Amino acid sequence: MQSAVNEFLTPRHIDVTELGPTRAKVVLEPLERGFGHTLGNALRRILLSSMPGCAVTEVEIDGVQHEYSAIEGVQEDVIEILLNLKNVAVVMHGKDQAVLSLSKQGPGAVTAGDIQVDHDIEIKNPELVIANITSDTSLSMRLTVSRGRGYQPVDARATDEDETRAIGRLQLDASFSPVRRLAYSVESARVEQRTDLDKLVLDLETNGTIDPEEAIRRAATILQQQLAVFVDLEGEKEAEPEQKEDQIDPVLLRPVDDLELTVRSANCLKAENIYYIGDLIQRTEVELLKTPNLGKKSLTEIKDILASRGLSLGMRLENWPPASLKNND
């Protein structure tokens, strides 16, 4: 009787309904009374304010010295162009900053698809209109794309370089979060005779750089990592200056075979020199889908198994691989 009273219900049913290519509805039930709002509000705040992503942070437009200029032969003024550039959905693989170029001869629309990118950079909304050229003229610009988290105004990125920055390098407030809209609601749920339970409904829309399901997984992982410190309260830990190498989660040092993947998925990973779980979580979905013979079904299997262990694809690890693995090799 005592154990039944102290035991908390955990969600048994997780239903994901795709409402579009970048929108999904996720339903979790049952939850103990009150836990719907507790978890829903925590996930909502993380998804809207703390998710990592990429955004345009600086622009140089040929012939433009400040944002209050007008460009001859271009319908939009510079401020409108900058606002449109904020909506470019870009993904960078393996780098934190890149400079891209855009050059278009008019007349006609200038879209995000006209941006020239490297092989490790993707534009997810190439149809986005940046400007409209109304005459036989050209529009050229250079875009600095950076990786960050949440929302970052220009003032928060202030550095010593600002005083010597050349005229014409226009700074943008950046919204790095890939989540465009999120709403959650809590409905009633029932398990046998209990009718006082919660059902959490998340309606999430992204900018296309990440799947809605993956966004929720990453937000849950962030929340889990932040709460983990409360599990073992030992007070303030003393610094260990003699320890040169950061501690690595032992789970990441285990071979991918421990994930008990299907033979097909395991062989595909090994063919790409992915031997440890730490190697795997640093790969992105796009990178894995480029692996020969590894399809979306195998990718879904990998993501689900990682999520069950509180992990996800696209994570970044410092000092990987650790010295212990290098020595073994």
From Swiss-Prot:
GO biological process per UniProt: DNA-templated transcription
Gene symbol of the encoding locus: rpoA
Organism for this UniProt entry: Saccharophagus degradans (strain 2-40 / ATCC 43961 / DSM 17024)
Record GO terms (molecular function): DNA binding; DNA-directed RNA polymerase activity; protein dimerization activity
Enzyme Commission number: 2.7.7.6
Annotated protein name in UniProt: DNA-directed RNA polymerase subunit alpha
Annotated region described as Alpha C-terminal domain (alpha-CTD), given as residue ranges: 248-329
Domain of life: Bacteria
Enzyme class: transferase
